[in-house]
Amino acid sequence: MIGLFLNLLDTQNEKDKFIKLYDKYKNMLYWISYGKTQSCQDAEECVQETFFYVAKHFEKIGDVNSSQTKGYLATIVTGFSIDVYNKSKKYGRIDIENNNIAENLSYFDNIETVELSSAIESVLSEEEKIYIYLKYVYGYKSAEIAEIYNVTDISVRKKLERA
């Protein structure tokens, strides 16, 4: 499967970097996804979707070992996992209160950011939190977020506006 992803990359350096990224994070992403979907098949599908998306947008990956890259990947796989879970159940939301992305990945470096994060965590829905992280932490455009979650750009902008 990794061969498919490598075909999306242009240079040998990118391919080598992708292999390192894949080897380093595939298990972590699987367990994050499995925690949300409670299904081995769905978790594997979400991990593959995550790496496919990353290969298509590989220019957004910085240092493979950085906490920002780790958080970026975790956010994407979480989004895919929630989407798969909701589609399979067709109702309800995933309770991930005890699985706070910010706490698990430690990508907040100072007190002000931690305070802002806790305010976000207590007020926003899970979908709004993910949109906020992708937009303001990782610099995604609303159109890119819409593409990830198969929703309209207008829907993403409205959610961000309400958040």
Would you name each region that the model predicts?
Residues 75-96:
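Arg/Lys-rich amphipathic alpha helix in sigma70-family domain 2
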Residues 31, 45-52, 56, 67-79:
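Structural recognition of an alpha-helix C-terminal capping motif at a helix-to-coil junction
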Residues 6-31, 35, 129:
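A short, charge-rich alpha-helical start-of-domain segment used by transcription regulators
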Residues 91-121:
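Internal acidic/polar
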Residues 82, 143-163:
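DNA-recognition helix of helix-turn-helix
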Residues 22-41, 57-60, 121:
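Amphipathic, Lys/Arg- and hydrophobic-enriched alpha-helical face
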Residues 10, 51-67, 88:
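Sigma70-family region 2
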Residues 122-144, 148:
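Short amphipathic alpha helix immediately N-terminal
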